[in-house]
Amino acid sequence: MGLKILVFVKQVPDTQNISGNAMTPEGTVNRAALPAIFNPEDLNALELALQLKDRYNAEVIAATMGMPAAAEVLRQSLYRGADRAVLVTDRALAGADTLATSYTLSCCAKKIGGADLILCGRQAIDGDTAQTGPQIAEKLNIPQLCYVEEVKEIKEGKITLRRAIEGGYEILESPMPALLTVIDCNLPRPVNVKSLMKNKRAKTKSEIMGEYKNDPTAAEAEIAKTAAKGLLIEEWSAADIEADPERIGFAGSPTKVKQVQSVILTAGDAKTVEPTADAIAELMHELISDHTLG
């Protein structure tokens, strides 16, 4: 495989189902209290990577940072066609903001090495900052191309793509390696049955150890068996990626979230307007006067 594509994906809390205990006293999201889903725009990034795999016979690596349960989004990535999966998990990574997260993921990218393209969703729905992708690019000192809709061509070490801008789009060319953030621009493919059957037993070392917690010998045997079948999801700690302890997790995060809540917009007073030019003109004047418009 000539082209190597790294896709950073994320398991996020379903922010449409915020409960009363969604925040910890320290100001971080209590992920255990919320249903977990595959971050939507990361699915778009994965789909774009898989389209490039189909076109250029690329290798697609899915990687994520999170709790051990985040291995599920990696399995979902394998089911859709990713070739390899990496989980970066460590208690020291908990409470990370975008600064600490991007540093950790840049360390992960360096350990994987050799990626021609790094793809991320534009933003994660649990933060809506759109900061992590560009920050990774800055830390890796590679070009960043944001709001990508389509890859036109990859040729002679350069990528030509289309990205959305306000009021239209632009066509850009960039040298590789480069990082792309991808918007909701495609329809992510469903799980591939063949890939599902192949990877349904893909697990991390921690998951296997948990299943055989009373029998370490059997656990080691199962780990070796899973690895031999190519089904062991790689699992790295902060030390494995050589991350600076002062720059990760809560310790490396200057941002603290005070509160997360679902906001439901409801109608207040209602006013019926006659479908005449004078009535509509009067309504427009009223809306402009109270600064609802303009």
Where are the predicted features?
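N-terminal glycine-rich FAD/FM-binding segment characteristic of electron-transfer flavoproteins
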Residues: M1-G294
